[in-house]
Design a protein with these regions (language model features):
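Acidic, Ser/Thr- and Pro/Gly-rich low-complexity regulatory segments
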Residues: 1-237
């Protein structure tokens, strides 16, 4: 039985990370990462692969692994494998679909997620390890790259990795929520309603990705799923 092509073109419900069509890009550099790629939309670009920050992903991976023990890595890989279709469905290409093999795709999500969370943790801990704090300009560009719509991983992946981290080291009530870590590094100011929430309430907030988090803060409806609306517009940088 043939399906109507209009139904085949429908976006899956998980879709939230888009490749911006060239015809509406007035300046390509506004949509293109400068230091590193996150996710499949800019994966493998020669000009990014040669950047030092791409090489730092391996270093971040090793540093993150040194924080944890147990079976967290196997659990996270299994989580990515189990949710691979859902993760792939979050990305929308101008034409076609992601052609990366499952092995390459899963490895990319693994390293990119750990890279992001290690950056958030390093910033929280105030460490000067060569990844952050070398210059104001570099930190600004890192934040800028992490906020680009085309340069995202789904937030639920970072959330799962964060849960494995705090479960492994056993400091749930002492360690900041992922929302707090993210807002602190990205310079997104949380309204008083959010600051007064418990970590468990933070965990209930639905975020699609960092661009969505920034958008929600700017329009004053974070968290929209809890029916809270703030009249205050928030500063990001």
């Amino acid at each position: 039985m043939m399906q109507d092509s209009s139904f085949q073109d429908l976006e899956p419900p998980e879709c939230c990370i888009y490749k911006i069509p060239d015809k509406i890009k007035r300046r390509r550099e506004f949509y293109t990462p400068l230091l590193f790629s996150i996710g499949p939309l800019h994966y493998g670009k020669v000009e990014l692969a040669a950047m030092e920050m791409e090489k730092q992903k391996l270093r971040c991976y090793d540093k993150f692994c040194s924080r944890l023990y147990g079976t967290w890595q196997e659990e996270f890989k299994s989580f990515i494998q189990h949710h691979e279709t859902r993760i792939r469905n979050t990305y929308r290409y101008i034409s076609g679909t992601c052609t990366l093999s499952s092995d390459v795709f899963r490895k990319m999500i693994l390293y990119d997620s750990i890279f992001i969370l290690e950056i958030l943790i390093s910033y929280h801990e105030g460490g000067n390890d060569g990844i952050l704090n070398q210059s104001f300009l570099k930190d600004y560009i890192i934040r800028r790259d992490l906020l680009l719509l085309e340069n995202q991983v789904p937030y639920f992946i970072l959330d799962e990795l964060h849960k494995l981290l705090i479960a492994d080291i056993g400091i749930y009530y002492e360690y900041p929520s992922l929302l707090t870590l993210s807002c602190n590094f990205l310079r997104i100011r949380m309204p008083k309603e959010i600051l007064s929430m418990s970590k468990k309430e933070h965990d209930k907030i639905k975020v699609a990705h960092f661009t969505d988090l920034a958008r929600s803060a700017l329009v004053g409806i974070l968290p929209r799923d809890l029916g809270i609306s703030s009249g205050n517009f928030l500063e990001i940088f």
